[in-house]
Amino acid sequence: VVTQDFIEKNGVADQVSTQGGDFTRNDFPQNCDVAVMASNLPQYNREIINQVVQKAFDALLPGGEMHLIGEMLDDDRKGPMDAAIWGLMEVMSNSTGLAHSRKDCVQYFKQAGFENIEVHEFIPDILVRVTGAKPK
């Protein structure tokens, strides 16, 4: 609802649509240009993230992009602290979550079939963005 209000207020409702749901259970809409998963990465284990990234890949049109934004550990898994703390908090709360590394996230994209996979600083030492494109 909030996203749809924002889209309408900015006059792009004829260009952008959203669909609510539980991305771990519900099917994704088909023929999408872009899929975004943001700021909930540590809440889920590797199996769930693999499934979600694969569902996004399957829903995208050829050339479509996925953007995964979240708290990610460096490849050596020694930091940054925010990503480690989020992962620890998930373990302590008995969720399925854990701290994923940048390397883990790139692997999720590769396994799904994405190409042109890139890792970008989104908010330094807090959020990272991994992007990939579905082959044309």
Regions found by a protein language model. Give the residues of each.
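Alpha-helical subdomain
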Residues: 1-136
